[in-house]
Amino acid sequence: MIRGMRWRLAPLSLAGAVALFVLLALLATVGARWGWVRSFLGDVLAVVWVYLVFKAFIEARVLPLALAAFGVGLLVELGQYLAATWQLHIPNRALRIVLGSTADWWDVLAYAIGFAAVLAGEALFRAGRPKASAPRSSMPVR
């Protein structure tokens, strides 16, 4: 385990992951005929979803978790490439939809955009939080 990481449960991140999972499921089913919008946006959101799942259970800095989520996307893409190279076929239709079946550089771009979206979103979230202020003196100012 990377130094500074601890197991924990973050309910807000878990709720975000569940909500995003529902959105991804709707995108995969209802939006099945939306072509590249469904597939590209789905890949962008998939990295964000993996990040939220990691964040829900692992307390760590943003960058390592975001890189891990991006890495999961790259591993899926590598798996697709190797499956095509070795002419392997995933028999389960649902798993084939989730994992995809064709390696594509556009998918890697979508994963990179998802990674950047995670970093930007976390930066905006942290910027909106109140800063810890220095303790005030109990001595009255004259």
Cite the ranges covered by each PLM segment.
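Compositionally biased, low-complexity intrinsically disordered regions
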Residues: 134-136
